[in-house]
């Protein structure tokens, strides 16, 4: 079962990677696009990282990213993140996802996820 879940999750991460790589530079930081392409990729990676964590308590994304993404006012990052920065974040997320799935047990999968705003088991949240 872990292999099946990883193949599907991994394929989704691969598709995001393909989109990031294929995005033309002119579109990447185009402020006229709402939402901006780079921001959609960042938002996806941030929440992949967060939801692969035990809970939001103590969660810190890797530098140069911050917790501003969780601000209820919808603050955008202070600058446009580069493709290279998001590619590194994607690799971080891919490895974290692989490790999370590999260490999954039936007991762990049935546990409530550690995010108070989600009434789901860990398995339900990941699917």
Question: What is each stretch, according to the model?
Answer:
Residues 73-111, 123-127:
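Acidic/histidine-rich alpha-helical segments that form the ligand environment
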Residues 2-3:
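N-terminal leader segment of winged-helix/HTH proteins
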Residues 18-21, 49, 53-56, 95-106:
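Charged/polar positions within long, soluble alpha-helices
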Residues 6-10, 14-17, 25-72, 112-127:
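Short, contiguous alpha-helical
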